[in-house]
């Protein structure tokens, strides 16, 4: 229901949603007018028939919340639907590798980009997502490999599939990451030719406006959209303290599969607590409010084209 809601919300406001880890749901595809298909190092859920239905492809090299490492999905969350999507056994912890198994360097990345272009008949852009670490070098390598766009994901990003020490202490923050990525593209003569998408810690229209002012062409939100869905919020159906031993607002139980509001779970009883239509409206309202904040800031700077 969460992925359906995000797809519907993106369609309502005219932007794109992303499949994220583990493949595409047909219901998600039907809800999303514009869908970005992620290609992960693990290849979990990868399906060429789904790939060709996307409006863009995103090769994930790293994530800002856990750069240089893979991920771990606890077995309690690997129920039938997830296991089917990922073609793996139910109830078993699923570990994602830190790198793509079929390429070792930038030359192989260029080959992979070419393969994805051929698979999609050259119809859609191919983006590369980088965790913000060696930003200058990594952005240059991705741009030279032929990426149409580069997603620079900062350390302020979130994840439910990594150690707390990595989430809190590894990577580079959003502002310096954008500046370094912009200058890397400028040195190659590719600034404004290769799209720069900022993600990680974008929580408001002000954050988005700052990112664009620093040189990003677009922004992506993750945690903010989950909060708009109702993440960490007490609802009539939920009882945080009784169900997970934590109070609303301090949940941090995404990895358990017991999300009281029905977002980070596959339990049918919990999933039913999230109405996809109502949730989509909340997310759409949030994105519209971000847009209005950006417009206000832009107008205050004397710019007439918002």
Language-model regions, residue ranges each:
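Glycine-rich phosphate/ribose-binding loops and adjacent secondary-structure elements
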Residues: 100-271
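N-terminal capping/small domains of soluble enzymes
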Residues: 1-82, 86-97, 108, 277, ...
């Amino acid at each position: 229901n969460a992925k359906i809601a995000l797809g519907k919300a993106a369609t309502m406001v005219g932007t794109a949603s992303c499949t994220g880890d583990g493949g595409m749901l047909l219901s998600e595809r039907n809800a999303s007018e514009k869908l970005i298909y992620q290609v992960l190092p693990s290849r979990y859920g990868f399906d060429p028939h789904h790939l060709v239905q996307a409006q863009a492809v995103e090769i994930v090299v790293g994530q800002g919340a856990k750069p240089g490492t893979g991920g771990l999905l606890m077995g309690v969350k690997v129920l039938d639907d997830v296991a089917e999507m990922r073609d793996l056994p139910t109830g078993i912890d699923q570990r994602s590798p830190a790198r793509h198994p079929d390429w070792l360097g930038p030359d192989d990345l260029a080959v992979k980009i070419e393969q994805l272009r051929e698979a999609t008949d050259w119809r859609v852009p191919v983006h590369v997502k980088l965790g913000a670490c060696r930003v200058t070098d990594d952005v240059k390598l991705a741009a030279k490999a032929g990426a149409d766009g580069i997603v620079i994901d900062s350390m302020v990003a979130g994840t439910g599939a990594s150690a707390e020490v990595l989430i809190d202490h590894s990577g580079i923050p959003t502002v310096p990451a954008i500046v370094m990525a912009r200058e890397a593209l400028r040195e190659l003569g590719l600034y404004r030719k290769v799209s720069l998408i900022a993600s990680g810690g974008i929580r408001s229209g002000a954050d988005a406006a700052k990112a664009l002012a620093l040189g990003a062409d677009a922004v992506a939100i993750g945690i903010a959209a989950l909060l708009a869905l109702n993440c960490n919020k007490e609802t009539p159906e939920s009882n945080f303290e009784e169900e997970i031993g934590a109070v609303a607002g301090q949940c941090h139980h995404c990895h358990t599969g017991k999300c009281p509001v029905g977002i980070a779970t596959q339990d049918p009883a919990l999933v039913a607590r999230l109405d996809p239509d109502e949730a989509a409206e909340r997310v759409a309202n949030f994105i519209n409010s971000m847009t209005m904040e950006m417009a206000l800031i832009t107008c205050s700077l004397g710019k007439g084209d918002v």
